[in-house]
């Protein structure tokens, strides 16, 4: 039989058709050629299918007679107790990721509990020999699984109606094949009334599950073969990833799938108050794991292991050092027992003692990053599978809108949407339905957990490009630099272009530099972090650099993201050869340069697939294209604004860092007219108002000055005509021009023009 290949990630849906009458009682599953190739199945391979009702079915793979793709027909002769024994209803949908190949080795022995038919006119119960003969005939050359029920074909002769598989298949194997050499015995004790829990699909964790499954199956399933080959397999596995990605759920699911005994322990719960109590608790847990391993393979799971084994070396860490030494000793001794695998999980791998991460202890590390677009869609499919979702809800759109959300965040989002649906459906409380408006309301309350402690996260008011008057050339350059790479990554890859690392906006005050960045964040639909000097600077040495690194680390977890450094000249310093001391601004500048260069990117910050997606852009379908788009845009874009670019360090302005430098000029007459129209959009204007004349009279006015001019004109109208005034007249604008003076001057513009013409700023783009 084929080896267990794991669940197929994100497969196409298959329509469930009624079973062919010729296949009744054969335990066959008819699939199209595309599905067979995707599963890697051969003729007669054992396939485990998760049914829509929550149960599962065990059958053998066979090609469809008509060779059609997109359909599945199965004979549910061997199913879990929670499933219907009869044929499933037609018209259902089963995704390909619900089908999984399972190993099916020959069984040496098998114990079953027969369920007998009620035969009319029978003088007594059938003899055990007759029942055993019927059982052998029913199970001949069929795959079975422990805990499943095998139903007799309709109309089949014999006293047996169904068989409950009590024991037989080895625990690591989900299934086993009944052969003529299999010794079948009849159990006198009926199976437990407790139904096994249905298998829960691991949405978005298929890649990590495959890695962990491979590490666990080798020592648990083939210990003697590995010992004879002299191979040392990993005895410890460390799961690393941010909180809420599903590390604990992954371990429980893989342990259930491999048939291993799971001993789950929360590491903080082992801490004791008395000296030596923690070490005693740790020894007791490892002893319990060895006792369980004497009966079946055991998986010891230490959750939040960083709380138990922190980094040693501090002056007041003697108790922690003793605990770490005890854990190291026990991990070294666990290698003698090949039936125990230790798995630790943490969201702070750097806080672990380095001695735990050497070969022989936690020598394998599986990193579970923040879910990508495809993984978020898979998680949403699992969460909403049992929720009354309206047909108008687009999971693809929800996956696009949930950048930076982990599995726990998505669960909270769906739960909040269900609460909103319950509140809105007062008239139909018996059958509430969740629609897209409920999810939009939930978005206002549930934000990514990785952004809840980020410095500089602001709830910006959406600003459209049309709300900014003038500056059409500047808008186009910003779209080309930032928006186009985010929305059209295939075209950039095809032309060999890369996304800019940073953009610098400079110009006189009040010329809409900050407003342009807000409009950019609104149009790109990406995460937005605004950082100021008040957020960064701290009286403690090294704290400012640490805060800036934390901002970039958490922004990378929510990419695509824009980090906005407003008034960057007040945050960063300019290094000089003559100055030998290094102040805090120089150290912050050094951290920013390293972040822009990509130095110090940690493994735990990985997102998306390990495979290189850049060479596959031409063959991508829609979902794969969205996945490629997210992986391509996995960097953080830095947008800085200043009105003093002359004080910035030259190293910050070279290509590869702030490599796109855009000058934001004051508005010309056409731009001033556009700004006046935007500012007076909601103001009732009199018929005598000529905005063209006002624009001609406002030379050297910035955008902020024009907005202030419109406000002053409206206030003058209220002062002169009282609160009953309905319009603003031309005379109010002319009167306001006498009090509102321009903030710019010819000297200021000449200064910027001379600055632009300097040699070191020859790369600046005059607009």
From Swiss-Prot:
Its EC number is 3.6.4.10. ATP 2 binds at residues 507-514. PROSITE patterns: AAA. Gene3D superfamilies: 1.10.8.60, P-loop containing nucleotide triphosphate hydrolases. The modification N-acetylmethionine is found at residue 1. One of its GO terms (biological process) is proteasome-mediated ubiquitin-dependent protein catabolic process. The keyword Acetylation applies. ATP 1 binds at residues 241-248. Disulfide bonds: none annotated. GO terms for cellular component: cytoplasm; cytosol; nucleus; spindle; VCP-NPL4-UFD1 AAA ATPase complex. GO terms for molecular function: ATP binding; ATP hydrolysis activity; identical protein binding; polyubiquitin modification-dependent protein binding; preribosome binding. It catalyses: ATP + H2O = ADP + phosphate + H(+). It is an enzyme of class 3 (hydrolase). The keyword Nucleus applies. InterPro entries: AAA+_ATPase, AAA_ATPase_domain, AAA_lid_3, ATPase_AAA_core, ATPase_AAA_CS, P-loop_NTPase. In the context of 55LCC heterohexameric ATPase complex, the ATPase activity is stimulated by DNA binding and inhibited in presence of RNA. Keywords: Acetylation, ATP-binding, Cytoplasm, Cytoskeleton, Hydrolase, Nucleotide-binding, Nucleus, Repeat, Ribosome biogenesis. Belongs to the AAA ATPase family. AFG2 subfamily. ATP-dependent chaperone part of the 55LCC heterohexameric ATPase complex which is chromatin-associated and promotes replisome proteostasis to maintain replication fork progression and genome stability. Required for replication fork progression, sister chromatid cohesion, and chromosome stability. The ATPase activity is specifically enhanced by replication fork DNA and is coupled to cysteine protease-dependent cleavage of replisome substrates in response to replication fork damage. Part of the 55LCC heterohexameric ATPase complex composed at least of AIRIM, AFG2A, AFG2B and CINP. Associates with pre-60S ribosomal particles. This is ATPase family gene 2 protein homolog B. It comes from Bos taurus.
